[in-house]
Amino acid sequence: MLDEEHGGLGLEQPITTLMAIYEVLGQYGAPTYVLYLLTGYNTIVREGTQEQIDACLKYLGTGEQVVNSACTEPGAGSDVSGLVTTYKRENGKIYLNGTKTFITSSKGVKYLIIMCRDADNPDVISEFFVDMSKPGISLSPL
């Protein structure tokens, strides 16, 4: 849940509140992207750069799906112990290499938070904020 600084309520027990929100949204058949937005925004506000925060929060309240998380992979499902997508740091840049699948409600999102392993140290798992308009990214409907 967002803090007051970013337009939220600044709740003391955001997880309890989030669970209640999910339950009510589910009862009314809310679109799934709403559920992904709630947690995605929280991750971005907590871990993102100011530029990333601003890029996402400008869409807050528009109803547009802006961000989603991608950890599910072919052959591994959502079990992160089976992640094979990797990242490598070279010449001041970070390169991601791998395939994600079944990323629910992600068609048309502007940004994905992609989970992957360090190619040089596979015990390290990180998440990266990826602008989906950048070259080298391809999407395929299932």
Regions found by a protein language model. Give the residues of each.
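A short, Trp-centered hydrophobic/proline-enriched beta-strand micro-motif
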Residues: 63-72
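Buried hydrophobic positions in well-ordered alpha/beta secondary-structure cores of metabolic enzymes
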Residues: 3, 21, 49, 69, ...
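Internal helix-loop-helix
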Residues: 1-63, 105-108
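Short, solvent-exposed loop/turn segments at the edges of secondary structure
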Residues: 38-39, 80-82, 109, 123
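A structural signal for short hydrophobic beta-strand segments in well-ordered beta-sheet cores
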Residues: 85-88
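Short, solvent-exposed loop/turn elements at beta->coil junctions and helix N-caps
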Residues: 7, 71-76, 101-102, 142
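A short core secondary-structure module
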Residues: 93, 97-140
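Hydrophobic, small-residue-rich alpha-helical packing segments that form membrane-like cores
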Residues: 76-79, 94
